[in-house]
């Protein structure tokens, strides 16, 4: 059997942080997909996992050294506070140290009921498991901090939702699964001792440089805010819409987590919403930075009494820290957008240049991903302008912007060929297009055909490369193929 070198620090925290629970065995598990490179990174034997991984990753066989538990947390869901949520269908097996010396969680999602399941069955359907595998690995390839997919395993038994669906278990790897909602769980109970214990644990695990800070808990809030600002800026750079930015889905580590109703934009529209449960657009594409700050304010509320013994001083420190978030986000976002349009230097007019392009894209219903990818070709040769402009409903509307952009490029130091290569390195050709994800899920769920799943994984693992044989995967959906709504899948 594969050896996992577990060292389970979270399981050594007080008992009110989690519930110990064993996975519920399933009927006939089989391994759909193993992420062999990630297994190697975690110090696991991929060959052995191909043989006996189905038993481990389904929950039928708990590996030696694992201490399975479900984590307690609360959270604001669409702005409404729920004092107890917790892992209702996810079980943390334990922690391993990877090849880079980083501590990583290994969690089974869909492994059975826990004390936090409420009325749920603790199971996952195949479709959401495949979606999370595809999108989390695509995000990693795009360079966006994210939890990872180690394995997808079929359970051999059905789950009952609006219809009967094949069941599966997703094996997730994360820097940790500690969320803003983890702090809220203890704050809701007035348990400041546990908040301090959790904060000390987080500092030791994720932010050890803060241990010697004069105000370590305030520094923790600032550090989490900085990571979230950088993360959400990266989401916007690749057209990603999380869909369910509840406080229980915001990690303290700064990784993207929980891909239930997530999606990528096709035509650029800042108001884009895909999630079926986001009826009022709270988590729309352009709202994500502000929601990030709102969530961080909820984190600050749990920590504020640790900032200073004088209440007014503590509140002022918290507000100042939260105020820095917007500045940090704007810098990350604008720096990234500069790179997307080929700029290395900073000029005051750059924000207007970026915003005017986005306005043209919105008015012209231009594809977000393809616009920036084709702009790289135009940076090298103006003959590519026609193909770029064809993405817009009124192609000629782009011409004045291109003239303005080229005048700005004249003040840049890079040769055109280097600039185009740099732009291609930040503007993907391939993303997990929503219609392609749905096609892959449908083939697997309805026909047990995983070929589209495998093909999509392959293409999106190299998002910045031109892949001439896979041009169809770069294309927007045809009429009738558009995905207008996504679902949580729980």
Curated annotation (Swiss-Prot):
Pfam families reported for this sequence: SelO (PF02696)
Residues of the active site: 248
Enzyme Commission number(s): 2.7.7.-, 2.7.7.108
Swiss-Prot/TrEMBL keywords: ATP-binding, Magnesium, Manganese, Metal-binding, Nucleotide-binding, Nucleotidyltransferase, Transferase
Keyword Transferase attached: yes
Catalytic EC class: transferase
Catalytic activity: L-seryl-[protein] + ATP = 3-O-(5'-adenylyl)-L-seryl-[protein] + diphosphate; L-threonyl-[protein] + ATP = 3-O-(5'-adenylyl)-L-threonyl-[protein] + diphosphate; L-tyrosyl-[protein] + ATP = O-(5'-adenylyl)-L-tyrosyl-[protein] + diphosphate; L-histidyl-[protein] + UTP = N(tele)-(5'-uridylyl)-L-histidyl-[protein] + diphosphate
Nucleotide-binding is among the record's keywords: yes
UniProt GO molecular function: AMPylase activity; ATP binding; magnesium ion binding
Binding site for ATP: 86, 88-89, 109, 121-122, 172, 179, 258
Cofactor(s) the protein requires to work: Mg(2+); Mn(2+)
Recorded family membership: Belongs to the SELO family.
Role this protein plays: Nucleotidyltransferase involved in the post-translational modification of proteins. It can catalyze the addition of adenosine monophosphate (AMP) or uridine monophosphate (UMP) to a protein, resulting in modifications known as AMPylation and UMPylation.
The protein, known as: Protein nucleotidyltransferase YdiU
Source species: Rhizobium meliloti (strain 1021) (Ensifer meliloti)
